[in-house]
UniProtKB/Swiss-Prot annotation:
Record's protein name: Transmembrane protein 41B
Entry's Gene Ontology BP terms: autophagosome assembly; nervous system development
A GO term, aspect molecular function: phospholipid scramblase activity
Family, as annotated: Belongs to the TMEM41 family.
Amino acid sequence: MQVHERSHTGGHTCQCNHGSEKKAPATGKVHSEGGSARMSLLILVSIFLCAASIMFLVYKHFPQLSEEEREKIKVPRDMDDAKALGKVLSKYKDTFYVEVLVAYFTTYIFLQTFAIPGSIFLSILSGFLYPFPLALFLVCLCSGLGASFSYLLSYLVGRPVVYKYLSDKAIKWSQQVERHRDHLINYIIFLRITPFLPNWFINITSPVINVPLKVFFLGTFIGVAPPSFVAIKAGTTLYQLTTAGEAVSWNSVIILMVLAVLSILPAIFQKKLKKKFE
């Protein structure tokens, strides 16, 4: 892993220098890494502002709304917001089908790309607005694309930030990834179903520890389907819910755990067969 190699190289350099020469390169390296991290953060903020501008254009091209309806067009922060937003969108969905769909699609991807809370409510909302097959495909596609854009942002400009703030955690996860390298897609699916690692952490560290983008996208697309299934089904009874937690029952949790185990079983059997024939 690059994080590990980087620290190893730094340690080797320090051992080869003596006296005052030993401190100068280390200080220069700290300033260099700090500057790189700051520059990366500035670039990320610039990209975020550009994406926010696109979101504003989508909002401006939305159908003409009343003042009361405009106040409800916002990223939902709780179930009341989701209900209010669902009421407005359902009113315009049939007449302005494409506009509503594009607004939903871009908003979901925007939230996923920049790890902004609220996508769980959009998943629930999709079950209220659309037929189940379309809703499930939409949520999986938006999750896969949004996570992949987050991956690409980290690949292009986020590495210094990961090195500076998350290197220890990234090294630990890199070791896990190496153990599952032969069945990586199953491992990604397992992580997406289970809550063991935050999604934002998976997104930004995957390019640093050499998880291929194709595997990352497919693992995410498939892995988010089971939890999304639960949220979308809950969306059919949107107005009976008072919190997002009510969308998840004990039956749902058990089903998710079973699916998580099933996703990792091929890898377990593959390891056992490999040991048997060696």
